[in-house]
Each structure stands twice: as C-alpha cells, then as structure tokens.
Regions:
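Long, compositionally biased low-complexity segments enriched in polar/charged residues
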Residues: 42, 79-83, 88, 93, ...
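Bacterial Sec-dependent N-terminal signal peptides
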Residues: 1-30
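N-terminal export/targeting and maturation segments
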Residues: 23-92, 177-178
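Intrinsically disordered, low-complexity regions
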Residues: 36, 63, 97, 155-156
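Extracytoplasmic electrostatic interaction patches
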Residues: 110-184
C-alpha cells in the first residue's frame, strides 16, 4: 500500500513537471516581434499569439513626442501579421498607459498600465548606450523591460482572470536575464 501511494505521488509529480515545462515551451514558441527599430518591449498572452507592441513615438522632426512618448499597437499574428492601433476599450481599460513627465530637460517619464496602477515603469535614456529603455525597479535596482507575459485562466472576454504576469528583464550591469512574477 505504501509503495502504491508513493508510485502515485511520483507519477503525479512527473505529470506536473511535464506540463509546467510544456507551458514554458509554449511561451518560448511565441513569435518575437522584429523589424521595429523603436521597439521598447512587448506583451504576449497565453490565449493567442497576438502581441501588444510598445514603441518610442517620434514626431516629424525626429524628436521624442513629449505628449505621447510611447505608442502602442497590436501585431495580429493570428491573422495577417498586420499592425493596428489599440481600440478605445483596449487603450482605456487594458493596455493603454498613464504617462507622467519626470524631467522635461532629460525627457524622462514614469508610467503605469491603465489596468494595473500598482507598478510604475520608467522611460529613461541610458547614459551607457544613449538609447531609451523602459526600466522596472526591484529593491531599488533598475532593470530593462524586454517583454511581459500575461497568463490568463478563465474569466470572461470583458473581465479575464489574470493568474499572473511575468516581466522578463535584463540587468544592464551584467546583461543577465531576470524574471519578476507578479500575482495580481
């Protein structure tokens, strides 16, 4: 009896490990946006391959648009790979940004997602490579945001149940990858 229970536990453990590895593989098999020279980061969700793209927004003079420094678009990988602006609902309740200027001279900004105000991100020009990056802080240390994965399980079309977010980061001091998991 003891060995039979032990065998069941072992089998269940293997199944759980297999499917957790499978979930990681699914995320890794998502398309990576390329060909966007002003890309800051992107968001992907487990429900489909469509991707939300966040890019620097320059004006016609080639300067960063102070009133809207980040533009947000969909890449429709599920259909024709077209690029589309967010609609009103997506922009106002899900993937849009609340942006505030931190330093007008340096053109640095803080922002949060309209759907999740608890975490602040920063758009700052790096003193190292002189490029703009989006930064996220952990224990007062700044990391560069590369992508965000949203795991949705259940809910409805209008109110999906977000199980967790994974923010994939890069440590600019040593170029190491770091993942911050947030359970809302």
């Amino acid at each position: 009896m003891y060995f039979k229970n032990l065998q069941k536990i072992f089998t269940l453990t293997l199944i759980v490990l297999f499917f957790s590895q499978f979930n990681v593989l699914i995320k890794d098999n998502f398309p990576v946006p390329n060909g966007f020279k002003n890309m800051l980061f992107y968001i992907q969700r487990n429900i489909n391959k469509n991707t939300i793209l966040y890019e620097l927004n320059y004006n016609e003079n080639g300067e960063l648009n102070e009133s809207e420094p980040i533009k947000v678009n969909w890449i429709n990988y599920e259909t024709d790979k077209s690029l589309e602006a967010l609609n009103y609902i997506q922009r106002s309740f899900a993937y849009g940004l609340n942006i505030k200027i931190l330093d007008k001279q340096k053109k640095s900004y803080s922002f949060n997602f309209v759907s999740y105000k608890k975490k602040i991100l920063y758009l700052i020009k790096s003193s190292i490579d002189k490029q703009y990056h989006v930064y996220y802080t952990i224990n007062k240390k700044m990391f560069i945001v590369q992508k965000i994965h949203i795991q949705i399980e259940g809910g409805t079309f209008w109110v999906p149940k977000v199980k967790y977010l994974e923010i994939i980061l890069n440590d600019p001091s040593n170029n190491e990858k770091k993942i911050e998991k947030i359970i809302p």
